[in-house]
Amino acid sequence: MAEKKFDFWRDHSLNYLQMAFGYDRHARLQNPDGYGRRTGECGDTVEIYLDIKNGCIRSVTYDTNGCINTNACANTVSHLAEGRTFDEGWEITPDKVIEFLETLPEGNYHCAELAVGAFYAALANYQELQRNSWKKPYQKGQNNDSGNQKNSIHN
């Protein structure tokens, strides 16, 4: 008996498809409250931009040059984070992203690690800017060299 061929549209979960093809959060904020960037060994880069008010994450936008799986993961991080408190943001993990997507291919779990890593970098950047608010006017968002760290994410 022949092995069933994978049908992208029928075999992926609705959550995966919505996150992979949703681009409503795909944007760069000019003056983010927090910014993080990570590049994986696969070459994909994810940049995360946070809008936080009174300790609540109002919006999370992102930019990526990555594959459809990286887009799905970055979009999922944004979806899971919006409306949470800053402290609750740290509870978002690669496993929670994978669980939400349901059908992220196992060979692409590093995409979830990459997206969450960029999000954690943005949370840490927000925390730093809260301690040293004088730095915010000098933050360059997507050109911020301090966030341009290479991740050790494998293909």
Predicted regions and their residues:
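C-terminal binding/interaction regions
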Residues: 1-30, 35, 58, 84-88, ...
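Short beta-strand elements
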Residues: 44-54
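Short, thiol/selenol-centered motifs that function as redox-active sites or metal-ligating centers
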Residues: 64-73, 111
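A short catalytic or substrate-binding loop motif that flags glycine-/basic-rich loops and adjacent residues
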Residues: 29, 39-43
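Alpha-helical support elements that line or immediately flank enzyme active sites
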Residues: 69-84
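Short small-residue beta-strand/loop micro-motif enriched in glycine and branched aliphatics
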Residues: 56-61, 71
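Hydrophobic residues in beta-strands and at strand termini
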Residues: 52, 62-64
